């Protein structure tokens, strides 16, 4: 069983960019685990891995989003910074955060249900939810990497 801990919110020894990248790595590792789980459905999944993911998913996603909304986004929106379309992009990302957190809660609940009551769980729905979630997280991270991190480098 692989463990993923939520990344520490702030670390004074690290740059803001390094902390963003730490959160990205943590979330991408969870996405890889979710993809392996989706590939193992319907009958080759590891119940312990499901349980582990179910307890780690929401806290990891919430921690990354809290960090972005309290540390990264305010830095990018500081007065005097060249903003361009960044305000619209950040608003969209905040909305995606809400959607991702809601999906993470749903997935966690379904994973626990799948372990405790496998005969009542719609495995096809579970696989679809997992794939939609990890694809969305990966796209979100790719956008932040390609658009927000270069903006952050310009102002640091």
Segments and roles (model prediction):
Residues 1-156:
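Small-residue-biased structural context
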């Amino acid at each position: 069983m692989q463990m993923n801990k939520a990344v520490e919110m702030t670390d004074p020894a690290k740059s803001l960019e390094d902390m963003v990248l730490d959160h990205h790595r943590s979330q991408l590792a969870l996405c890889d685990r979710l993809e392996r789980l989706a590939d193992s459905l319907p009958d080759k999944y590891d119940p312990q891995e499901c349980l582990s993911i179910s307890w780690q998913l929401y806290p990891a996603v919430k921690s990354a989003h809290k960090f972005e909304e309290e540390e990264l986004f305010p830095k990018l929106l500081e007065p005097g910074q060249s903003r361009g379309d960044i305000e619209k992009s950040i608003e969209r990302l905040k909305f995606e955060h809400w959607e991702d957190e809601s999906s993470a809660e749903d997935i966690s609940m379904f994973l626990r249900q799948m372990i405790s009551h496998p005969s009542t769980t719609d495995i096809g729905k579970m696989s679809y939810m997992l794939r939609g979630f990890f694809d969305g997280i990966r796209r979100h991270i790719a956008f932040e990497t390609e658009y927000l991190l270069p903006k952050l480098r310009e102002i640091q």
